[in-house]
A protein has these predicted regions:
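Nucleic-acid-interacting cores, centered on viral/eukaryotic replication and modification enzymes
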Residues: 1-234
């Protein structure tokens, strides 16, 4: 499906899927929250300064499907009985363009280290798979952080936008995701692409936790690139 994404086809490529077929393979983000809970959630996030609203017509759109790039949301019960909020961004992260100007790196860029002979990293791995952080991005990044579904303007009359039919929530923090979610999404995404015939199995990029930058004894230099199609924010 290279052509559908605007890339040049190669002579040895298998028959290409058209844009409609590719779009059918791309899952929609999940939205598992009731209307009443959704409103309470947005009121709370607005109160603590983690949400803003914009005109949904200005949203970036998927280059193949034309759907707006908005993350799904759902809740998950924790062992303590509390709930965690999950933002589901699976369908868009693989094709999201780098922002113009100064932008923050993707979550995968934060897990690559190369140490010299005398360098040491000391850390606790008790909860290492859930390295969690929230950063305050600039306005350019916020435009790519829509989540949930648009809401009626009368929900938040103080934030009403002239001419906008609805208000689209935007998340104001950049949140690192859980590597477990990335692994699952990567495996599922590969299976979908291979089963559909979009990519031959031997043409896939190897995936790993980061590049092996040094030469192993008796072997050539190996460079393994991360292939993240998910950064589910917790």
């Amino acid at each position: 499906c290279r052509a559908a994404f605007g890339f040049q086809e190669r002579p040895d490529d298998p028959p290409q899927l058209d844009a409609t077929s590719v779009g059918d393979l791309i899952p929609r983000p999940v939205f598992l929250i009731s209307r009443a809970e959704y409103r309470k959630l947005l009121v709370f996030l607005r109160k603590v300064g983690l949400v803003t609203f914009r005109d949904p017509r200005s949203l970036p759109k998927h280059p193949v499907t034309g759907r707006v790039l908005s993350a799904g949301i759902l809740g998950a019960d924790k062992k303590s009985g509390a709930q965690r909020l999950l933002l589901d961004r699976r369908p868009q992260n693989a094709i999201e363009e780098r922002l113009v100007g100064l932008s923050l790196p993707f979550a995968g860029d934060f897990v690559r280290f190369e140490l010299g002979p005398s360098e040491v990293i000391r850390t606790s791995l008790r909860d290492g798979k859930d390295q969690y952080y929230v950063l305050r991005p600039d306005d350019a990044r916020v435009a790519w952080q829509a989540f949930g579904q648009p809401v009626d303007s009368d929900w938040f009359p103080d934030d009403a936008i002239d001419g906008a039919p609805w208000l689209q929530p935007y998340f104001l923090g950049l949140m690192q995701g859980d590597h477990n979610a990335a692994d699952i999404a990567e495996a599922v995404g590969r299976a979908i692409l291979c089963d559909s015939g979009a990519f031959p199995v031997d043409d896939l990029m190897p995936a790993g936790r980061g590049p092996r930058m040094r030469r192993a004894p008796g072997q050539g230099v190996a460079l393994v690139s991360d292939l993240y199609i998910d950064d589910a924010a917790v």
